[in-house]
Amino acid sequence: MDVYLVGGAVRDKLLKLPVHERDWVVVGARAEDLLKQGFLQVGKDFPVFLHPSTREEYALARTERKSGKGHTSFDVFASPDVTLEDDLARRDLTINAIAQSEDGEIVDPYNGVQDIKARKLRHVSEAFTEDPLRVLRVARFAARFAHLDFTVAEETQQMLQEMSASQELSHLVPERVWREWEKSLLTQTPTVFLTLLRDIQALSQVLPGITADDSQLQRLQRTSAYSDSVTLRFASLFIEQETPESLKQFCRQLAIPNHYRDSALLARNHEDFITTPELPEKAQLAALLKQIDYWRRPEKLEQLLQLRQAEYSESKQQKSIAAQHKKLRSGAEKAAALNAGTLQQQGFTGKALGDALREQREQILAEALN
């Protein structure tokens, strides 16, 4: 029985990047062999085990054969006769098909080390086309490693284009599409994910409604340079969305979590506030705070201010926008602290109470912004 470190951990070590989790493959063993050593089996579709002390994942060497449509229809075969090379052959990219033995020896049957040096994302074999999810994985890796100058190999780009044309991507479940996109939004260059899918004519299949036009991409890049927040990055893509209904439909179609949808709707509904360098007049500001329910949900104003700051983060107005926001935050906090009970004690009731509360809040905002 031989044990090898595989996949992303080996790749990231070779790239001198932090290794966050380690996966292992076990060659020449049966499930019973690991169970006897105290491993806990967790994989239902294929034999994966948790180490009794480290809780890291150990998988028996296996091969796969496509048995139907989509990315889940595979027959898995695990046996002591499956070699390390057989196991690595089923992986997507050569940079992910490198192993390291327990004594530190690199095993690289598909020239992944060479592709790391050449900064190329290249498929391991023709079996790559059997799993449509790999199109999104390559796009995600392209986004993740773009800052290290990685690009997709020409023959792999051609294969991605052919997979897109085959309509295999239509068999992907929405949750998996979203998961890959969400991961790409965590990278330094999330625009690369979208541009690659656009270039291979896959964008309309997996993310209908995302155009990846210049305006959308530039705004996403600005927001990404300004903030690590996936929520802000996602919301920035929908600032110019035509209707709230189309945005809601898009989020339903991809099973996108509600907090992302709500943030995108907030951005879309307040496009003018985000994209106009001058703040609105005091009455409009007070109305905005009421509309977004600032008095109970102050985080909504903060999101709008962050998106607005990102919008001007590369302009000469950056400092003046930041100064505006500092004053607005202060004024909004003071306005929120205004107590309606005090006004009631002064004799205000009903509509008069509401009018007085609004007028005093407007006055507080005006004073804060002067």
UniProtKB/Swiss-Prot annotation:
GO terms for biological process: RNA repair; tRNA 3'-terminal CCA addition. Its cofactor is Mg(2+). Its EC number is 2.7.7.72. The keyword Nucleotide-binding applies. Keywords: ATP-binding, Magnesium, Metal-binding, Nucleotide-binding, Nucleotidyltransferase, RNA repair, RNA-binding, Transferase, tRNA processing. The keyword Magnesium applies. GO terms for molecular function: ATP binding; CCA tRNA nucleotidyltransferase activity; magnesium ion binding; tRNA binding. InterPro entries: CCA_bact (IPR012006), NT_sf (IPR043519), PolA_pol_head_dom (IPR002646), PolyA_RNA-bd (IPR032828), tRNA_CCA-adding_enzyme (IPR050124). ATP binds at residues 8, 11, 91, 137, 140. It is an enzyme of class 2 (transferase). CTP binds at residues 8, 11, 91, 137, 140. Mg(2+) binds at residues 21, 23. It catalyses: a tRNA precursor + 2 CTP + ATP = a tRNA with a 3' CCA end + 3 diphosphate; a tRNA with a 3' CCA end + 2 CTP + ATP = a tRNA with a 3' CCACCA end + 3 diphosphate. Catalyzes the addition and repair of the essential 3'-terminal CCA sequence in tRNAs without using a nucleic acid template. Adds these three nucleotides in the order of C, C, and A to the tRNA nucleotide-73, using CTP and ATP as substrates and producing inorganic pyrophosphate. tRNA 3'-terminal CCA addition is required both for tRNA processing and repair. Also involved in tRNA surveillance by mediating tandem CCA addition to generate a CCACCA at the 3' terminus of unstable tRNAs. While stable tRNAs receive only 3'-terminal CCA, unstable tRNAs are marked with CCACCA and rapidly degraded. A single active site specifically recognizes both ATP and CTP and is responsible for their addition. Belongs to the tRNA nucleotidyltransferase/poly(A) polymerase family. Bacterial CCA-adding enzyme type 2 subfamily. This is CCA-adding enzyme. The lineage of its organism: Bacteria, Pseudomonadati, Pseudomonadota, Gammaproteobacteria, Alteromonadales.
